[in-house]
Amino acid sequence: MKPQLSFFAAILLTLFSCQQYRQKEVDRLDITFLTTTYIKTTPVKDQGEWPVGSLYAYLSWIESCRIHKGDSLELSPIYLMRFLCQEEITMRKHPDFQLTPNDAAILMRKYGITLYDYYRKHLNIRPEWFIQNQQFFASHPEQLDIVLDTAFGYTPSHIMLYGATYTPQDLMQSVWTDLSETSFIHPKQIAQDDNRILIDTMKNLLYQGESIIWYGDTLQEGYSFPQGIAIITDKDSPTLISTASRHLHAMHIIGIAHPSPRSSLPTYDSSTTYFMAKDSHGTNNRREGMVFLSEQYVRLHTMAIFHPSLGSVENQWGLS
């Protein structure tokens, strides 16, 4: 038994060392970026422990659209999280609070939106608590409303903006009238050489002053929120895309950047173009809440990108 134990211990040590090497490579990189394209946006917010990056990214995208049109406003993700929580607990057999940007659009069409200053609160409750108490709320639905009002706050029936009064649904129609035209482009099973279609689409939109919602895998060794970068760290990383261990997350792409000449570049990632993403985990990282995604990382780990101009392309591509 001892030789077998030693053998397995050696394997575990080797795997641990490889993991440490890959993570250390990300952590020891000293990359500064020169931003060549930047789209104005609102301050970075923090989704906390709730898996609702799609809500934050979508609202941030709408906010940038409004800035582009000449006005500035901030929208409340907490307002939509309240209704998401209500639907997850009352309508789903196995709630997990996971949602895509398309799910976020459906919530907005259904419940409208409100302003950040009208509905903002630091949440002291976790989604797991609601899941653990789902059966209780099924038999006591009135208690769920009480808990939601206490945890999230009472929902406003009317909002004042620019001297006019809106309901949340009216505000949604006033702020963004093209929700029915939204669509996603899914990069499905394209040969790696043809992934330039995805990259070129993103670049062209950004060069035109249009930001993008990115939806992809952030559970890779080369993804580091503390460092604010996402790179390829392993020659075999393309095989990771088909694993079941993905962690899908949405971010708002607001710019294009390039490493400065004095930057220490990653070993396996030769990207000279990085996409500047506004994340929703606060500003406590090296890039004040931003994450720079390398072109190669985007090629390999994108599930979908969003912009209305992409037409009605959906599920034409996609990751197996």
Positions of predicted regions on the chain:
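Bacterial N-terminal signal peptides
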Residues: F8-L15
